Amino acid sequence: DNYRQQNYHLTASQRLSDLWNMNLTLHYTHGAGYYEDYKGGAKVKDYKLPPYIDSQGDTIAKTDLVRRKWLENDFYGAIYSANYRGERLQFSAGAAINRYDGDHFGRVMWAKQSNNLPEPDYEYYRNTGDKLDYNMYAKANYQLHPNLNGYLDMQYRGIHYTIEGSDDKAGDHVNVDKHWNFFNPKAGINFQKGGHNAFVSFSVANREPNRDNFTEAGRDERPQHETLYDYEAGYGFGNSRFHVGANLYFMDYSNQLILTGKISEIGEALTSNIKDSYRMGIELTGGVEIARWLDWSGNLTLSRNKIKNFIESIEVYDADWNFLREDHNDLGTTDIAFSPDIIANSMFNFSWKQFSASFNSQFVGRQYIDNTSCKDRSIDPYFVSNLRVGYVFKPKFMKEIALDVTINNLFNEQYETNAWVYSAMVDGERYKEDGYFTQAGTNAMARVTFKF
């Protein structure tokens, strides 16, 4: 990528009294850049190029070419806040308005049949995205009791989003004009006494689709905004020797934007709306000082991440890859993609005089690449450990020399952390194409730090 930005900020703060202050920020960012790639055997119609007639009079529908895809954008706005800090009450209110204006366009820089280009640096698509994003909020935290406080946070957010022009997919026209109005409240109570702490909270959060949701949408797909209702409660206890904690959560979604397992042409992970889904689980944390020179800490997350009544949409082609129709399979309750049921971490830290060491391990359960809960489209569970050792020398001619050696993937686990998949029905058979992002085996890194 060849991309540059210029960022400008103007910030003003005013202290009105011991209790009140105000802040105002104006900002502007301009960016422009591109990436360039070679496409072998590209269809000329995908680049709005006329068919090439060779010397024998044959029509050539494909050519090798170099394309350059550009982004030129402006982002600017204003952010304001007023803050009150009293003995029992802390209060903030504010507003913001921001606008993003971005041009996406592509040029054919070179083609094997150069006389096929209507003009140098031929532009084959251009579209403009414009996003106006404004919000107002107020939040308060009140000390109800020396050991008890409550908080309330309310936000209104409005969005106007448009995309207009031709897309890079065979010049398809894109026309998006969407308005959203969101109300995002959050409330909770916190309790603290001695080494004990507990909380309960409820919040609502809304999220709009992004550009890819519109430009990469499937046939008859109409991206919607996501709404989350989040319920959480937790308890913890700690002292100078150990600490434990447990958090319970239930996240109820409407139209959740969920990873599909598919990727775009440039490798971006794609999402799509799922009407009814949830995530629920428990997060456990703990730690203990085993000795003055040794301590352990760890965490464990156990969860269920489910789609209710998932309907798989699958494209159907004939033997020559001509599109026939789109079928739908009702799969019932399935697992959400890339959402393992178990994640566990453990870390031992050792320190003795000038020597230190740490040993950490992580286990991640099975992750499904798409939302069908099909095992042959999944990432296997993996367990990985890393070891770090260090020693600090204190010579007379300088403050210190610190030497660290880290061995990653100590036991040479063969594993992947991400993947993509494309599946279709071709000539009556299930077709699958996938790719896995494999991770490095055992590897080491050494570092020397000098302090004067």
PLM feature segments, named:
Residues 3-35, 39-168, 190-194, 198-201, ...:
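Face-selective signature of the C-terminal outer-membrane beta-barrel domain
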Residues 17-19, 86-89, 145-149, 157, ...:
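Outer-membrane beta-barrel channels and translocator barrels
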Residues 28-32, 86, 97-101, 156-160, ...:
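Transmembrane beta-strands of outer-membrane beta-barrel pores
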Residues 6-10, 74-80, 132-138, 183-187, ...:
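Hydrophobic, lipid-facing positions within transmembrane beta-strands of outer-membrane proteins
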Residues 146, 250-252, 272-371:
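Gram-negative outer-membrane beta-barrel transporters
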Residues 19-27, 190-203, 207, 224-280, ...:
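Membrane-embedded beta-barrel scaffold of Gram-negative outer-membrane proteins
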Residues 1, 38-49, 104-117, 166-175, ...:
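Flexible, surface-exposed loop regions and adjacent strand-edge segments
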Residues 140-141, 231, 286, 301-302, ...:
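Conserved C-terminal beta-signal and adjacent last beta-strands/turns
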